[in-house]
Swiss-Prot record:
Signal peptide: none annotated. GO terms for cellular component: MIB complex; MICOS complex; mitochondrial crista junction; mitochondrial inner membrane; mitochondrion; SAM complex. It comes from the Eukaryota. This is MICOS complex subunit MIC10. It is a single-pass membrane protein. It comes from Homo sapiens (Human). Component of the MICOS complex, a large protein complex of the mitochondrial inner membrane that plays crucial roles in the maintenance of crista junctions, inner membrane architecture, and formation of contact sites to the outer membrane. PANTHER family: MICOS COMPLEX SUBUNIT MIC10. The chain crosses the membrane at residues 17-36. Keywords: Acetylation, Membrane, Mitochondrion, Mitochondrion inner membrane, Transmembrane, Transmembrane helix. It is found in: Mitochondrion inner membrane. The gene is MICOS10. Component of the mitochondrial contact site and cristae organizing system (MICOS) complex, composed of at least MICOS10/MIC10, CHCHD3/MIC19, CHCHD6/MIC25, APOOL/MIC27, IMMT/MIC60, APOO/MIC23/MIC26 and MICOS13/MIC13. This complex was also known under the names MINOS or MitOS complex. The MICOS complex associates with mitochondrial outer membrane proteins SAMM50, MTX1 and MTX2 (together described as components of the mitochondrial outer membrane sorting assembly machinery (SAM) complex) and DNAJC11, mitochondrial inner membrane protein TMEM11 and with HSPA9. Belongs to the MICOS complex subunit Mic10 family.
Length: 78
């Protein structure tokens, strides 16, 4: 695995982790305010779920060295 490919995988993993943790935190806030009388555990639970999902995705990416994520290229019409 080349260094640039490894860097792309790390970048993708960190971006995925930020999105999933942020989404879990946001859902935790919503549930905390609406259902659980402003308790803190929904925030921790949502963030933990997001972190766990991101970790699982990163682990899968790094253990599949031959799986390359491609980009879609539009075919130009003539």
């Amino acid at each position: 695995m080349s260094e640039s490919e490894l860097g792309r995988k790390w970048d993708r993993c960190l971006a995925d982790a930020v999105v999933k943790i942020g989404t879990g935190f946001g859902l935790g806030i919503v549930f905390s305010l609406t259902f659980f009388k402003r308790r803190m555990w929904p925030l921790a639970f949502g963030s933990g779920m997001g972190l766990g999902m991101a970790y699982s995705n990163c682990q899968h990416d790094f253990q599949a060295p031959y799986l390359l994520h491609g980009k879609y290229v539009k075919e130009q019409e003539q």
